[in-house]
């Protein structure tokens, strides 16, 4: 079976400069892979490249068999990115944002179920995102991720902004999703938190994948 994510000598540019300069990575369906490395190593750029948001200019790059160099838009239909930017509209309520993402992804997932799974109570759902605390915004982003029913999750420092209860909830969601066959790439500096969730770890440094460790 072909890997869900396949990168071989993949190069990405930010402006004229290489942000990723020869990435090699294969990820199978249902695997959870931790990307670790120092700030500026290229972890976020790698996630954005897999999401089809940053072009791969050289090398091999396929996601779900789709050539990233030819059709990034087709890839975006199948991935959900949880990053530093929330992807939410401040003037809309949580519920309105989650419904928007369900429609944008043409998903059949129920927004109410996604909000339940993200631990968002009924009263909070009607608050505008611009009025939320950092933790509430993160849960809203989680609900938007869940409702897209994506085959690949790309999580950039996903525990950031969550309290202890929210962190436990996120861990459970990752385990459940992987058990259901969702492929997950997770970038984190919180190694003690993230390592128990993953199948293996990839070191990213200087725009390269330097080492692969079996967790």
What are these regions (language model features)?
Residues 187-189:
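H-loop/switch region of ABC-family ATPase nucleotide-binding domains
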Residues 153-157:
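Catalytic Walker B motif of ABC-type/P-loop ATPase nucleotide-binding domains
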Residues 59-70, 75:
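Conserved ABC transporter NBD signature motif
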Residues 51:
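Helix-to-loop junction immediately C-terminal to a conserved catalytic motif
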Residues 36-38:
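The feature captures the beta-strand-to-loop junction immediately N-terminal to the Walker
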Residues 145-146:
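ABC ATPase C-loop
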């Amino acid at each position: 079976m072909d890997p869900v994510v396949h990168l071989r000598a993949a190069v990405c540019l930010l402006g004229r400069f290489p942000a990723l300069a020869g990435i090699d990575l294969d990820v199978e369906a249902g695997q959870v892979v931790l990307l670790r490395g120092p700030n500026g190593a290229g972890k976020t750029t790698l996630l954005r490249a897999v999401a089809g948001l940053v072009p791969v200019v050289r090398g091999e790059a396929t996601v779900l068999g789709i050539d990233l160099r030819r059709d990034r838009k087709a890839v975006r239909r199948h991935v959900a990115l949880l990053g530093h930017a929330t992807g939410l509209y401040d003037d809309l309520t949580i519920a309105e944002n989650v419904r928007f993402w369900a429609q944008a992804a043409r998903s059949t997932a129920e927004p109410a179920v996604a909000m339940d799974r993200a631990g968002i109570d009924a009263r909070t759902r009607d608050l505008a995102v611009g009025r939320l605390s950092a933790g509430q915004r993160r849960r809203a982003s989680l609900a938007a991720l869940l409702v897209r029913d994506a085959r690949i999750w790309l999580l950039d420092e996903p525990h950031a902004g969550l309290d202890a209860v929210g962190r436990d909830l996120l861990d459970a969601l990752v385990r459940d999703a992987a058990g259901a066959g969702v492929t997950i790439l997770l970038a984190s500096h919180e190694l003690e938190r993230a390592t128990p969730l993953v199948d293996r770890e990839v070191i990213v440094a200087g725009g390269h994948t330097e080492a692969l460790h079996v967790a």
